[in-house]
C-alpha cells in the first residue's frame, strides 16, 4: 500500500510550503512529480482569488475570484468550475497515469464543488502511488 499524507492546519501555517519543498526534493531525486497546487491571486496586497497549477505541464487556471460572475460561492469568491476541471482535475488524473508522486494542494470547499475533481482525488487515493496533499 502506498503512502498517503495530507497536511492540515490553519491558513498561513505553511502546509503548501512543506508540500512544495517535498515535491522539489523528489524532483531532485529524479522522481516525476505530478498533480496540482493552488495559490493566492493578489491585487496589490489584497487577495482577490486563487490560482490552480498543473505541476507537470505548468498550465495555470483561476480556481476562484471575487469577480467571477458565475459558479458556487465560497466566502467572497466564486469558483471557476471550468478551470478547476480543466487544470486541477486533469492534473491529478494525469499524475495518476504518469507521475511517481501525486500532489494535491489542496482539498477544500472550493475544490469539492467539482464532481470531476472528487473523482480524480478518489482515483489518486486508490491507484497505489504515493500521494502528498493538503486539506483546508
Predicted regions and their residues:
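Conserved lysine of the Walker
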Residues: 15
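Phosphate-binding/switch loop-helix module in NTP-utilizing enzymes
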Residues: 70-122
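Hydrophobic positions on the alpha1 helix immediately C-terminal to the Walker A/P-loop
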Residues: 18, 22
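Walker A (P-loop) ATP-phosphate-binding motif of ABC ATPase nucleotide-binding domains
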Residues: 4
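N-terminal phosphate/diphosphate-binding loop that engages ATP/GTP or pyrophosphate donors
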Residues: 23-79
